[in-house]
């Protein structure tokens, strides 16, 4: 996979770390609370084996319309804005569902139950599957062994709601 700047990254570099994977979008109603709270979470675990990986996605109401080279400026100057710098590793725009979904998300979705019980409209992909990610800022927590541990609904933005699970995985 590639970082937002085009640099290739091997997931081997995250071996032995607890990883939080999030599909992100700059122009979503959850953008400001999600980015600011994930920064608070990253700061809390700054000296531990914990990383957050963000994957911009335009499959939900087209709320990440920018080209890869423009996404960081949208975050810095629009939402959240004010020079905001996310404390997560940001990747290139990624398909998280459908015929062209990235294999990482195929793997994560197969290992963790969906957080939704119904589908919404304004989904821009096919085919639609029962375990699909259904909105921006859905999260997957992965243990140091690379095994998916749990999946969080996009409305879970408070870092306190994730800390027990993160602490469990860090101490494993």
From Swiss-Prot:
Reported tissue expression: Expressed at high levels in the ovary and at lower levels in the gill and hepatopancreas. Not detected in heart, brain, thoracic ganglia, gut, muscle, epidermis or testis.
Keyword Cell wall biogenesis/degradation attributed: no
Family to which this protein belongs: Belongs to the glutathione peroxidase family.
Organism: Procambarus clarkii (Red swamp crayfish)
Active site residues per record: 28
Any one GO molecular-function label of the UniProt entry: glutathione peroxidase activity
Induction text: Up-regulated in hepatopancreas following bacterial or viral infection.
Functional note: Protects cells and enzymes from oxidative damage, by catalyzing the reduction of hydrogen peroxide, lipid peroxides and organic hydroperoxide, by glutathione. May defend against reactive oxygen species that accumulate during the immune response.
EC numbers: 1.11.1.9
Pfam families: GSHPx
Entry keywords, A to Z: Oxidoreductase, Peroxidase, Selenocysteine
Coiled coil stretches, renumbered: none
GO BP term, example: response to oxidative stress
Name this polypeptide is given: Glutathione peroxidase
Domain of life the protein comes from: Eukaryota
Enzyme class: oxidoreductase
Catalytic activity: 2 glutathione + H2O2 = glutathione disulfide + 2 H2O
